[in-house]
Every structure is written in C-alpha cells, then in structure tokens.
Amino acid sequence: MIPYQEWHSQLQSLYDSQIFHNWALCQDVHLNDEKDGLLLRLIPTRQLQKNTERIENKLLNHIELYLTYSKVYNEPLLLLRIWEEKSIDGIPMTKLMLPTDIESLLDVQGKFQLGLDTIINLEGSVWYSFHPCDTSCIVGDQAEFMSTYLRRWVSIFIFSWLGYEDS
C-alpha cells in the first residue's frame, strides 16, 4: 500500500525524472493534475505487433497507458487501451481495439490479472485495468523502501512486459 499523499508526491517525481520522456517507445507523456494521473502514448513493441497480427489479424497504431490511484486498494492502478490502424474506403483511421484474449496478446498470462472496465472519472471510457489486488506483495511495501514504491511499481507493471530502452 502507498498512502495517497505519498503516491501524489512520487507521481510528480516520476514525471520530473524524465524516465518516460526518454523511453524509446513513448510518443507523448501528459501529467493530469485534475485527474491525478499520468497518460502515456506508446508505439507498440515489435513483439506486440507480431502477436496482434497473429492473434487478431490486425495492425496496431498505438497503446495508451494511464497511471492513476485506486482509493479502494490504496495502490497505483494501470489502465490500458490499444488502438488499431484501419482503413475505410481508403481513409486511414484509428479505432479502439478490444481483443478477446488480452493476456495472450500482451504476453502477460499468469503475471497480471486484467479486466475490462468503464472508468467513471475518465469520461466513462472503456479501459483494460491491471487489477491491483496483490500489488503490495508483488512490489513490497516495507516502510524503509516506501520512497521508491512507485518507481519499483512502474518497473514491474510497465517495463517488465514492454521493456525499457532509452531513446
């Protein structure tokens, strides 16, 4: 568990650290003070693109990740949306993709529990969420390491399956 005030402080520090700005996959980073979250727009990894072509027979355009805080679990919460490339009558467009087997597509079977949710404070939009139920066991919540909780959480819940390379 991470108290809300600590989460808020660490989120700002994480944003200021430029770790996402320097990430090769990251196209855009936006800190949303009103909604108390961090929005990332990512290019898909080669592996994710291959999985999508194989499993869904589609091309990806980008991935959206939204880091927010679960007041129910007192933990960080990762939300995800996948956007596919589509062409209708020769006009290119992007469309929200709702794969039937998201765990296989992301190659996170057995690592994380994902579910499809409607997020009220994000205009009622549909997102996949990485369920925060076992987060403190996965990340470790000893008091002496609390100052690095969010950074460790990001390395597990984001970089462990997407990888990290500086741009």
UniProtKB/Swiss-Prot annotation:
Reported effect, residue 26 to S: No effect on conjugating activity. Normal autophagic activity
EC number(s) stated in the UniProt entry for this protein: 2.3.2.-
Record Pfam families: Autophagy_act_C
Alphabetized GO MF terms: Atg12 transferase activity
Membrane topology (UniProt): Peripheral membrane protein
Primary location group: membrane
EC class name: transferase
Keywords carried by this UniProt record: Autophagy, Membrane, Protein transport, Transferase, Transport, Ubl conjugation pathway
InterPro entries in UniProt: Atg10, Atg3/Atg10
Biological process according to GO: autophagy of mitochondrion; cytoplasm to vacuole targeting by the Cvt pathway; macroautophagy; nucleophagy; piecemeal microautophagy of the nucleus; protein modification by small protein conjugation
Consequence of substituting residue 137 to S: No effect on conjugating activity. Normal autophagic activity
Any Gene Ontology CC annotation: phagophore assembly site membrane
Catalytic residue list: 133
Subcellular location: Preautophagosomal structure membrane
Function: E2-like enzyme required for the cytoplasm to vacuole transport (Cvt), autophagy and nucleophagy. Acts as an E2-like enzyme that catalyzes the conjugation of ATG12 to ATG5. ATG12 conjugation to ATG5 is required for proper localization of ATG8 to the preautophagosomal structure (PAS). Likely serves as an ATG5-recognition molecule.
Subunit structure: Forms homooligomers. Interacts with ATG7 and ATG12.
Family statement: Belongs to the ATG10 family.
Protein name per its UniProtKB record: Ubiquitin-like-conjugating enzyme ATG10
Organism: Saccharomyces cerevisiae (strain ATCC 204508 / S288c)
